[in-house]
Amino acid sequence: TETVSHRICNQVYESLVDLDPKKLTVRPALAEKWEVSDDVKTFTFHLRKGVYFHDAPCFPDGKGRELKADDIKYCFDKICEYSPMNQMFWLVQDKIKGANEYYQLSKENKPLPKGGVEGIKVIDDYTLQIDLEFPFAILPTVLTHSAFWIYPKEAFDMYKEDMRVHMVGTGPFKPKKIKEGDAVILTRNEKYWKKDSLGNQLPYLDGIKFTFVHDPEIVFLSFKKGEYDFTGYLSVFSKE
């Protein structure tokens, strides 16, 4: 299901910002801070340094490289591009400068601007600026949507639609084995940038295994026996 897919991908991919699950407020993620212009039409995001993509065959030496502002622009430009794979243009439509024109040109298969979407600008390796058509204070909240997860161009160039089974991100876990409809095994990202409040390296776990079981009775009995640490739902046939 979409919920399960999101739960898995959320361990692999990250955005500029995300939502604090307790406070439900926007907090820094790949961007450590950002500024807003007085007219609330320009947002400037400053990326964390030392954030690396997972090691993957899509890179020339198989080693994940450092995340740069060009990567953010690449992914955000893709959201503004017409494609059967892209169902999320509505999130930026009429909002980011040049987004509508970029989408229309790509839909008509016409040459795209060399600089990409006008309102998505790389200032330097660690700074990205987004220019809007009108004041839009909730832009950071919109950017917490999974459509804005960041991946490297190399991964898209190599895998295209098969990225669903060849995920490459910056998150706390990276794919170890993916068998569609059966199981997904993630392993700890040893190079993950985040630490807890005491300075301990995250994540705490060595790995996560997601198993797909469609029979609710089997799910309940297996969970009861301790075969699973977590399940998204429990069957109502048992009152225990």
Model-derived features: where do they sit?
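A structural "hinge/loop" feature
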Residues: 1-7, 30, 57-61, 87-88, ...
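Aromatic- and charge-enriched surface segment that lines or borders ligand/interaction sites
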Residues: 32-91, 129, 213, 219-222
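Short, well-ordered beta-strand elements
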Residues: 1, 32, 41-45, 72-75, ...
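Extracytoplasmic/secreted envelope proteins and their assembly/folding machinery
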Residues: 9-13, 31, 69, 73-77, ...
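Gly/Pro-rich hinge or "lid" segments in bacterial periplasmic/extracellular proteins
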Residues: 20-21, 101-127, 131-203, 207-209, ...
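Sec-exported extracytoplasmic/periplasmic mature domains
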Residues: 17-21, 49-52, 77-85, 137, ...
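Paired acidic/hydrophobic, glycine-rich loop segments that form the ligand-binding mouth/hinge
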Residues: 228-235
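N-terminal lobe/hinge region of extracytoplasmic solute-binding protein
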Residues: 1-38, 46, 168
